[in-house]
């Protein structure tokens, strides 16, 4: 059992962690921060005057501009 655990940790460290370091642009993205940078607001529903750009954190909230 320890043998399997050792190889699982080794495989995880060799694949997942190195891929995260090599390609940081594919990591997690803070969509709320991206919305604020583009002068948007995270709301449940956009008004008629606002334009819905993307989702914020949850699929139910939208970035409205």
UniProtKB/Swiss-Prot annotation:
Location, primary (coarse class): secreted
Regulation: induction: By androgens.
Annotated function: Has bactericidal activity. Isoform 2 may play a role in the antimicrobial protection of sperm and urogenital tract epithelia.
Family according to the record: Belongs to the beta-defensin family.
Species this protein is from: Mus musculus
Bridged cysteine pairs (disulfide): 35-63, 42-56, 46-64
GO cellular component: extracellular region
Keywords from the UniProt entry: Antibiotic, Antimicrobial, Defensin, Disulfide bond, Secreted, Signal
Protein's recorded name: Beta-defensin 41
Keyword Membrane attributed: no
Tissue occurrence: Isoform 2 is epididymis-specific and expressed mainly in the proximal caput.
One Pfam family of this chain: Defensin_beta_2
PANTHER family noted in UniProt: BETA-DEFENSIN (PTHR20515), BETA-DEFENSIN 110 (PTHR20515:SF19)
Localization (cell): Secreted
Endpoints of the signal sequence: 1-19
GO biological process terms held by the UniProt record: defense response to bacterium; innate immune response
